[in-house]
Amino acid sequence: MLTITRELRDRIVAHARADHPDEACGVVAGPAGTGRPERFVPMLNAARSPTFYEFDSGDLLKLYREMDDLDEEPVVIYHSHTATEAYPSRTDVSYASEPFAHYVLVSTAEGTDEADPYQFRSFRIVDGVITEEDVQVVEAYTA
């Protein structure tokens, strides 16, 4: 299960909406070994595409160096789908290289439920196997 604060969830969704019609992407880093997403890091979609995302290799290298210096790891790796449901594509699965990360997808496609105008879903992707997991949104983390 992914436990994430409402603030972080809202920031991910806001990034997805702001970059629409292109796919948005980013990382939420957290202290190594805790599984707790804390530091929101929106990234530039180097592909600038409505159907594909790609982290800029220089930005990604910089982020991994920062995380290493801060004893962090990528807890959430997120991106948006602009015209389809929030479910990993074959390309998404092929790029999923962090077996302990939560892969979050947000759909900004039209026609979603009015009560919940976007889909926010989390998956584990290990060795090409996709497993959807529950998302628990909290106001703050407990100790």
What does each of the following model-derived ranges do?
Residues 1-74, 83-143:
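Conserved beta-strand-loop surface patch within small alpha/beta domains used
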